Amino acid sequence: MKLKKFFAGVLAAAMMLTVGATAAFATTAATTYQDQSEVEIYKHYGLEGNGTSPEETFYLVQADKKVLTGDIKDSDIPDLTALTNAPASTDGRHYVASVKFGEGGAKANDAENVGEFVVKLPTYDHVGKFEYTLQEVAGNTAGVTYRLDTIKLVVSVINDGAIRVAGVHTENEGGEKSSSFSDNKYAANTLTVSKYVSGNMGDKKTYFQFELSLEPGTANGRKNFAENYTITYPTNGSDKNTTNTIVVGGASVKFWLKSGESISIANLPEGVEWTVSELDADGKAVANGATNGVYTVSVDGANGSIVAAGASETSNKASFTNTHEGTPDMGVILDNAPYIALLAIVAIGGVALMLNKRRRDEE
């Protein structure tokens, strides 16, 4: 019994020492804060679909500030240090950070698409805990998604203003706190228009004319597009294909294809709408199921909009199939059967007469 009491006492003493050491360590750790003059906020710029993002600069502005703890008013909190290379027109907003991605900077792999905002902290005359609300400026580039949720930057000022400790909260409502976010993406894909000819009388060497137009689409509104987009024609295609680019929201483009050929237009932002038609000899659009000369035209995807995320095998494609079935002309065919039968009857009759005459002569 005495031995049990002894071990119990040793265990209790060990637990007290452990708790005391933990408390002492916590007290010591609380005094090792380092002053922060700036805060880094990491941004991932993702890619959806099959495209190349244009050069893009993202900006953060200070939208609000407030005192969480302290004896000063919200208006007395110093603003975050202003960005030196802010846009010429700020619309009265207080720009505090930017990050630039070059052409093709959007990547599907998060390890390759990271950039950072660097927010510089001001000097403080008062201790306290202050919260800054940061907002990403929504740009106007077609295909780019901008972050809508705000970012909370909390600065704790201690030791009579000598030390600034910052924490970044990029969470959505009820989400996890983080100094990194992946809300931004570039979404684009390639449009393909193809031609096919079928049927035993179909001529696969005949060229057919088409007309294509591109519009921004409801989802893109008045966003900015590239000056133009390159049309890739088939190798050794028609000499009539002389228009090499097309403008979203601009004039339509006409081109020629024969069976088995396609054109493609790459890097069209998601939501861009296309309309493409096959033209008859008079330059009029041929409807699905109608005829173009001797051909019946079947159309799949004459109208549509560019899909990036979740695109299927049939997305972003338009195909035209012209069918001509017929019976080959074999020339004039004479039916000799009646004549052959008549000759056979005459021959049989002649043989019968000859045999009958011989029989009479023998009698």
Name every feature range the model reports, one short phrase each:
Residues 2-363:
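Solvent-exposed loop/turn and edge beta-strand elements of beta-rich ligand-binding domains
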